[in-house]
Amino acid sequence: MKQIRLLAQYYVDLMMKLGLVRFSMLLALALVVLAIVVQMAVTMVLHGQVESIDVIRSIFFGLLITPWAVYFLSVVVEQLEESRQRLSRLVQKLEEMRERDLSLNVQLKDNIAQLNQEIAVREKAEAELQETFGQLKIEIKEREETQIQLEQQSSFLRSFLDASPDLVFYRNEDKEFSGCNRAMELLTGKSEKQLVHLKPADVYSPEAAAKVIETDEKVFRHNVSLTYEQWLDYPDGRKACFEIRKVPYYDRVGKRHGLMGFGRDITERKRYQDALERASRDKTTFISTISHELRTPLNGIVGLSRILLDTELTAEQEKYLKTIHVSAVTLGNIFNDIIDMDKMERRKVQLDNQPVDFTSFLADLENLSALQAQQKGLRFNLEPTLPLPHQVITDGTRLRQILWNLISNAVKFTQQGQVTVRVRYDEGDMLHFEVEDSGIGIPQDELDKIFAMYYQVKDSHGGKPATGTGIGLAVSRRLAKNMGGDITVTSEQGKGSTFTLTIHAPSVAEEVDDAFDEDDMPLPALNVLLVEDIELNVIVARSVLEKLGNSVDVAMTGKAALEMFKPGEYDLVLLDIQLPDMTGLDISRELTKRYPREDLPPLVALTANVLKDKQEYLNAGMDDVLSKPLSVPALTAMIKKFWDTQDDEESTVTTEENSKSEALLDIPMLEQYLELVGPKLITDGLAVFEKMMPGYVNVLESNLTAQDKKGIVEEGHKIKGAAGSVGLRHLQQLGQQIQSPDLPAWEDNVGEWIEEMKEEWRHDVEVLKAWVAKATKK
């Protein structure tokens, strides 16, 4: 079968090779020959011989039929071959196509897989894109909201800057304006757009521009902030003083872009300061004027009384003259304290060191001190440790002032016994004075306080402060330090005190200060309501009160006291604080609620803790506080405070007002000031003080909050000077305490002083206004 296929293939290939015609002719010829051969073979077999007709017939028959049959067959074969070839080609193409399809199928699968991956990636990317779009929308919304907020904040900041009365401006590195607020526009008369790119010389006067440029250069040169004051002109010609602060401006990477400036109008502050300085100068001028006017008659009284003491006198005349002499010297030295205090405030105390006859100095000191001691029945001893120099170089007046102050205090606080002054001179040119007394002594907790300005030691029972200005020891110690020495003190309560004065003296000396003048005027007989629940305290208080000529009714409870009290029936009510049913504070509040203030007598608290609770008692409506156990000196002083014994008909209200005024105001200075310059200058100064005080108090509080000790002291000094210039003694004393950080426990107490200043200054001003109005009517 295989060979047949090969033979057929050979047949077809030959036909295709020779062509249809030639192959047909060749095949026909071959068939004719074959037919002849077969015919001859058959004839030979059948007949045994071959005739020519047989051959011709075979040739003819073969030539007639074979070509057509061969041609037809060849055509068929050719067509079949062509069909086969076409089929072969088609098969080949199909194979190629199949292979290509297979390849494409593989590629398609790969592409499908890749496409699936791409689709997955695209779907993921699409999801991420959608998420990003969502986040972007949120971010866009947030940015829009932030932009709106920024615009609102920018608008608010701009409105805030424009609403500020302070100047705000910016200048770049070329010293050109980059922006400003509304206040700056008003100052320059130009809008912000007009100011941009202008330089100071284009905006200010030549003098002002020069200072502006100078300060700008300092800021740029040193890269530090700068604060200064400068007067600038408004377009209408009005001048204003500004406190200007300039700071370099940096971006977030630390690159400087220019400076920012702020300016606050302090014109009014300047005016107030100038007014206060003028008032202070007026006060100094006033003190200087009356210094001469008072010293002349005082010196005459002292000199003439001393001369008269050397003449023949009766015992009574000598006693009176000694009183006049000591009182005049005391008054003069108290005035010296006031003068020195004023000088120390202005830092103008100067020492006049001259040769001093020390022997005569001690003799004069002994004579004068002995006179003062005799007034109270005391012994005076001068114990010099020899040898002493005959002359020393010092300010004799100042040394005498210090010693007189120490001796006067020793006599003042000694009821019986003696006062001893010891003097010695050591190597190193130091003079030592010891002033020892046998008086009441000083509590240990007050030893460090007695040298503070205005501090006054309480009496022996811890009640009312002893009389005096409270400035003598403070002035004396400052003077001693100026003279190269100091004053120290040792004391034992109930046994006496010893003050030691040292000064540097190749030849040195100083004067005495401050004396004491007891007021022995008779006291009025009062009807007293004593509210006390402890029987022993009742006995002590009743005995003291009746000893002074008073009649006493006793209430043991608060309820009984309220029932017993009737307006006009009692001249004085003494209230114990701790009662069985209520406190003395409750009684005071109830009485002030029931009755008008003018119908109430003085309400005085009895307590064992005056210093801690006094302000609380005063706030509850009480008029004063006495310490228990009740003492004659304290009670006497309190009665003198509320009653003018020379005019028993004067109303209690007036007496209370006067006593309060004396505690709050510098009455002598105000009276003399009123007589010399009239009320207008006082009221003008007071008006200035009222304007300045809120600012002072605010600064004080802020400095206290910031614990700025220097700032507190500076503001305290300002307040002290301002209050003193208008006669507000209480505020002046508070200012003195606030400005004196060397006072004992200053840091613990300064907050309370500032709070007291804040709470009381308006009340003190009203008291002064009322006093001026009343004094003017007189």
UniProtKB/Swiss-Prot annotation:
Residues of the Histidine kinase domain: 289-507
Residues with the modification Phosphohistidine, per the entry, are H292, H717
Look up the domain of life of the source.
Answer: Bacteria
Tell me the SUPFAM superfamilies matching this sequence. Answer: ATPase domain of HSP90 chaperone/DNA topoisomerase II/histidine kinase, CheY-like, Histidine-containing phosphotransfer domain, HPT domain, Homodimeric domain of signal transducing histidine kinase, PYP-like sensor domain (PAS domain)
Membrane-side (Cytoplasmic) residue stretches: 1-25, 79-778
NCBIfam families in alphabetical order = PRK11091.1 (NF008302), sensory_box (TIGR00229)
Q: What is this protein called?
A: Aerobic respiration control sensor protein ArcB
Originating organism: Escherichia coli O157:H7
